[in-house]
């Protein structure tokens, strides 16, 4: 079988593309590595998506998934490891199968950026990248957030009403937020401490993470806590595009034009994976734009 389009990733952008594909009567398939709905499920309260004055991230993710299922978008849970673009139709190779398609929408999003110290051995044992996933393990306990700007601010906001104390460690002289209201919320919290100009040196602990060694103006000290959340932002999920011929920028994000087209005719990228502003509203718009252009493209074949 040759699909009209294959959508790689079932976040807001991918599912929007899928909805438009099904409404356009395309033979579409969506392939998702983890959970349909995307990384928005990890968010706390979402207040900037039109139509919902206030909604929890996981609830919004579920609504996206349900909407796509209403239009019977087929979603297969598998990991895409390679796409072959030299011949038509394109070939999408997963861990468990191979698929042929006339067009592709890449909506693989991003993943947490690592600290680059010794944190890997403590993941699940005091180290986490997801406040919404793991915050309640630290009810009335002390936690550390290591990060910068909006990611660190969001994590601290998610934790401040759960943890006894939140210590934000940043290597910057100030924190900047994508929306000033977020910074206001953080400053209003009386259980949040911010340590500026602090360079993390090492995660300390034996069986589990117990704190972090930092250097502030050349002076080293150890900050103790029950848990540590790393919030340094995200990097694109584009490793599988190696040797695909699809152009990436120096940070690994997919290069596209204003219509979400890549340098290869028939292949599009939507949402966070193409960089720029990383917001649900933008990803949804990208999904709409990409699939509208794919429908036009297919009509000309």
Swiss-Prot record:
EC number in record: 1.8.1.9
Keywords: Cytoplasm, Disulfide bond, FAD, Flavoprotein, NADP, Oxidoreductase, Redox-active center
Known cofactor(s): FAD
Chief location category: cytoplasm
Reaction(s) this enzyme catalyzes, per UniProt: [thioredoxin]-dithiol + NADP(+) = [thioredoxin]-disulfide + NADPH + H(+)
Pfam families membership: Pyr_redox_2
Compartments (UniProt record): Cytoplasm
Binding locations of FAD: 32-39, 272-280
Top-level taxon: Archaea
Additional notes on this entry: The active site is a redox-active disulfide bond.
The protein's assembly and partners: Homodimer.
Family per similarity comment: Belongs to the class-II pyridine nucleotide-disulfide oxidoreductase family.
Name under which the protein is recorded: Putative thioredoxin reductase
């Amino acid at each position: 079988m040759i699909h009209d389009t294959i959508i790689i990733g079932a976040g807001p952008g991918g599912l929007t593309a899928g909805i438009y594909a099904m409404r356009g009567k395309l033979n579409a398939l969506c392939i998702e590595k983890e959970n349909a709905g995307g990384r928005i499920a990890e968010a706390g309260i979402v207040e900037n998506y039109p139509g919902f004055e206030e909604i929890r991230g996981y609830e919004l993710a579920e609504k996206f998934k349900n909407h796509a299922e209403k239009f019977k978008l087929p979603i297969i849970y598998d990991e895409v490891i390679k796409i072959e673009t030299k011949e038509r139709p394109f070939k999408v190779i997963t861990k468990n199968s191979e698929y042929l398609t006339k067009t592709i929408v890449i909506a693989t999003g991003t993943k947490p950026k690592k600290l680059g110290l010794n944190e890997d051995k403590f993941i699940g044992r005091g180290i986490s990248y997801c406040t919404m996933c793991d915050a309640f393990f630290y009810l009335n306990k002390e936690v550390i957030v290591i990060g910068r700007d909006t990611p660190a601010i969001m994590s601290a906001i998610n934790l401040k009403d759960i943890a006894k104390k939140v210590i934000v460690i940043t290597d910057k002289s100030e924190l900047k937020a994508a929306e000033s209201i977020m910074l206001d919320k953080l400053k209003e919290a009386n259980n949040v401490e911010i340590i500026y100009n602090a360079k993390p040196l090492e995660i300390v602990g034996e069986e589990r993470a117990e704190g972090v060694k930092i250097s502030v103006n050349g002076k080293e000290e150890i900050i103790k806590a029950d848990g540590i959340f790393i919030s340094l932002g995200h990097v694109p999920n584009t490793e599988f595009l190696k040797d695909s011929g699809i152009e990436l920028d120096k940070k690994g994000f997919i290069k596209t034009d204003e219509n979400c087209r890549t340098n290869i005719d028939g292949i599009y990228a939507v949402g966070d994976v193409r960089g720029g502003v990383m917001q649900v509203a933008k990803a949804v718009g990208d999904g709409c734009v990409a699939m509208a252009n794919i429908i036009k493209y297919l009509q000309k074949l």
